């Protein structure tokens, strides 16, 4: 099935698109991002001791932070390997290139499974992968967790759609993709669960009935996801219950909310990355 979807031509096109998209970083081999970049690089470097201890005293100014117990690291581990076998700049930008290329392939696969059209799939893949929100994550915020989560979200969409498939194992993709998301970015998991619940409510109001087969598949997916994610969820819960977490600052998000008016609409269609919009 994958051979039918992907050809050498598609691979070459997406390899070129990824290189063109990340050309500003590769041109002078710079590390972009001004907000979370240092945090995520330190997170990646701290994985050198992850299989012996989640706490690394060589990073984060030797504070011995518990970050790896509370922030999933599995999908970030390749970044550590790339940095280890090259150097910081090459490893970081090469990781961005690989993630961008994989995102293009995932988006193409997801849309092709839905539409069976290569042109539509290519348009979706390129628009999603080069969207302003994803560009902000790379070139401004350096939010590696959210960036990796964005690569997985299309698979979750497809997994949810496949729940309506008559095949008994159609829930497997949702379980696997949700597990990957849990091992990548916890906040995205919470947001995704909210969106799934909203979609189910809308579907219920449309059909005016509860579809038992759908509920059964969701329960199966949830159980398998939970079991596959215990390696992260277990230690996180254990550490949360074991000790109090003190936060130096608690923000009031309501004060920073964006008004969905003229400014938001204009920001959605202009070419300024720093403006607030729908993320395209």
Q: Where do the PLM segments sit?
A:
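Membrane-embedded transmembrane-helix bundle of lipid-linked glycan/lipid transferases
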Residues: 1-280
């Amino acid at each position: 099935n994958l051979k039918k979807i992907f050809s050498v031509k598609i691979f070459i096109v997406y390899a070129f698109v990824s290189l063109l998209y990340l050309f500003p970083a590769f041109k002078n081999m710079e590390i972009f991002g001004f907000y979370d970049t240092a945090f995520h690089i330190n997170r990646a470097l701290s994985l050198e001791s992850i299989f012996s201890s989640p706490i690394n005293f060589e990073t984060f100014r030797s504070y011995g932070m518990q970050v790896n117990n509370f922030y999933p690291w599995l999908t970030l581990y390749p970044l550590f390997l790339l940095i280890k076998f090259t150097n910081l700049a090459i490893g970081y930008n090469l990781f961005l290139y690989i993630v961008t290329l994989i995102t293009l392939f995932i988006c193409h696969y997801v849309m092709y499974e839905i539409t069976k059209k290569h042109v539509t799939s290519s348009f979706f893949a390129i628009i999603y992968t080069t969207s302003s929100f994803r560009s902000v994550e790379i070139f401004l915020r350096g939010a590696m967790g959210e960036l990796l989560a964005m690569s997985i979200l299309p698979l979750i969409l497809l997994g949810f759609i496949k729940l309506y498939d008559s095949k008994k194992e159609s829930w497997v993709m949702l379980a696997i993709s949700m597990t990957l998301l849990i091992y990548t970015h916890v906040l995205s998991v919470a947001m995704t669960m909210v969106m799934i619940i909203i979609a189910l409510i809308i579907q219920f109001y449309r059909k005016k009935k509860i579809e038992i087969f759908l509920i059964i598949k969701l329960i199966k997916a949830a159980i398998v996801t939970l079991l596959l994610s215990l390696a992260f969820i277990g230690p996180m819960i254990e550490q949360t219950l074991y000790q109090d977490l003190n936060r130096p600052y608690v923000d009031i998000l309501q004060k920073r909310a964006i008004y969905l008016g003229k400014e938001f609409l204009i920001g959605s269609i202009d070419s300024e990355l720093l403006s607030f919009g729908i993320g395209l």
